[in-house]
């Protein structure tokens, strides 16, 4: 029987390379206090408190997670991104902050600001670094949150990753359907499906 050690709403769960389930973040009930921890299922130890989840609450719900080819875990939350060690979950790399909207750099990509993320396709012989694409989001709701009309890409495993802003080719909107965002978010042909 699998059971969470911390009750949580709005977490992200991901199957790790070893088959375990990583559960990250959330709140204790709808609009409840933050649960700034991560845990593994089946249980292998205590929950681990993450400073970056505490610091960016409440703009880090449903953080974006991906297992990287190098074995690390890419995590994007609010307007920040890191790579975690897949064994002890310490931060092995801090990426530069993601650009937000042109008029408000404080814009974020994770819930409740509501952006989305996908891994970019790789092609044989798979020697190029893995890319990630994050689209949409909004500025914080204080003062009337506005949708972010761009996408950002990076290659997290590069020696010095940088974020590249990709302008959406349609009007600004918060995108919840990644397939649609993927087709419409970039003028760069290599990101367009055939």
Residue ranges and their predicted role:
Residues 56-193:
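Beta-propeller domains
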């Amino acid at each position: 029987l699998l059971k969470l050690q911390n009750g949580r709403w709005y977490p992200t769960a991901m199957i790790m390379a070893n088959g375990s389930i990583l559960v990250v973040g959330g709140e204790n009930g709808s609009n409840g206090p933050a649960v700034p921890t991560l845990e593994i299922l089946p249980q292998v130890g205590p929950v681990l408190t993450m400073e970056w989840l505490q610091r960016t609450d409440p703009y880090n719900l449903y953080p974006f997670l991906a297992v990287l080819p190098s074995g690390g875990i890419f995590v994007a939350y609010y307007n920040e991104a890191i790579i975690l060690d897949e064994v002890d979950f310490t931060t092995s790399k801090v990426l530069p902050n993601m650009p937000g909207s042109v008029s408000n750099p404080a814009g974020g990509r994770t819930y409740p600001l509501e952006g989305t993320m996908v891994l970019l396709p790789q092609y044989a012989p798979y020697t190029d670094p893995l890319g990630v694409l994050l689209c949409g989001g909004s500025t914080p709701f204080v003062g009337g949150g506005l949708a972010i009309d761009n996408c950002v890409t990076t290659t997290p495993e590069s020696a010095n990753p940088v974020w590249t802003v990709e302008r959406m080719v349609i009007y600004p909107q918060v995108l919840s359907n990644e397939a649609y965002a993927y087709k419409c978010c970039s003028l760069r042909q290599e990101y367009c499906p055939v």
